Amino acid sequence: VPGEDDAFLTNPYGMMYEEMTASCFLKINHDGEVLFKPDFGELNYGFNKPGYILHSAVHKARPEVGCVIHTHTPAGMAISSLKCGLLPINQTAMRFLKISYHDYMGVVLDLAEQEVLVKDLGTAEAMILRNHGLLTVGRSVGEAFNWMHRLETSCRAQLAAMACNTPLQEVSPEI
């Protein structure tokens, strides 16, 4: 949230992603206190504790980060489940040669996971959460979205190439 270093926006637990609009976000602080909750009428959408733990960890550790995006797309979840992870098989995927990985530790409900998560992310703009999904960060929503769009595109391209059932041509890391 611009001008509020201790606050960020997150989606409410239970609301479908396709239902989200700008007015649906909850504003919470790094301690997990809800600072603003829209009136959802009879629908009492709750607080997303796993989302809070994940997002607040990054915001606290990386003050330059203005936005954290975390997705569970089919392509992202598929690549996150492969031992090989994301391969440098095309120009877009080569942007992620230094991508971070975080091993699955179950549903993120323990604040203790924050330390491991932040250590695994390091200074990277993108991380694959093994057996879970994708995460990108940026100084702005646009920057984080741009990283996510490229990461998602790379995951889709890799799955399409792997479906051809022929050896993949990886690009040399020296390039």
Task: List PLM regions with ranges.
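Glycine-rich flexible loops
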Residues: 1-175
